[in-house]
């Protein structure tokens, strides 16, 4: 297990070859930190990508659709079992570590109070697995490093949680348990379960807890676990369904840049994020509480799937009407965008991205001056389509440009802009038996 071999294996699985040296450097960081912590080699290595959201702002938890891809940036991860029940996670990029000792990984799965930042995600993942798979031995050392821009709307927090969950689950053998086999039957099920670890909800027969405090869906997790190189993927949610994949034309290139304001899901930003989720839930409650027999819905998407139902709910929605309008309009863009990618229709994507950005600003209200300016700058720099993405209240934007001009566009758009060709899903790159 060498950095070069791991990077080469990742390229062989479909990652953009231009990323080879960056990933070799990332795995060098991880393996050097492992060697400093332990004398024996790691047992497992993974690549866990971030998520690029093309369309589908705040639709997933309402049962709507999203168009996403696995990003070219993400987490390099290695892990090995411990002889005790403790969990130690080392962030080789930050030079930081976190240890759950004495371990909370008991039948009680007691959460550690007062944790913030990435430590909270580690604690939540470890304790949820201990609760749902109480008979498994989850003690592990995990070393990771990321080249994702933090809090930029590329799902760095969800990717971290998935990295920890995958590592602990692999070492603990949870996929062989009756609990897993009875409840998780596909990668989409796994993605939905990982989302429930994050948001605290139960999944099928696997009971929930408090999660990390955000009330999100499984869009990010679905992209990370199901990504296809050079393709954008359509999903619908509640329940999760795959809608298909559309290849990004070879002469098109995604470019991503951050606005300079971190989209942290903490404090006021988390409250604003959760308010959008709560508004979607309130609309569903309005529909289901109106007393009409035979028309209860399991999601907001189901409540508006018929035009007459949508009109009925719109008439009832009052101050929630902008939230409803945004959901309906953004959800409808997904099949249109998939068709546009399939046809190579740049004009259609230009229109769809302009409308999505305008609706986020006017109806959803999750944009800030910096994200608005970033999208405007992308268009002025020559992008034929551009849009902000992620939870909002900071973060990043994507732009679509001709591949031949991508390098020049990156320099023109901003110093941190980078090419982001859709890559492979989470991959376990190598194991030792």
Residue ranges and their predicted role:
Residues 2-44, 49-68, 99-107, 111-249, ...:
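Gly/Ser-rich oxyanion-binding loop with an adjacent helix/lid
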Residues 391-399:
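N-terminal pre-core extensions flanking Radical SAM catalytic domains
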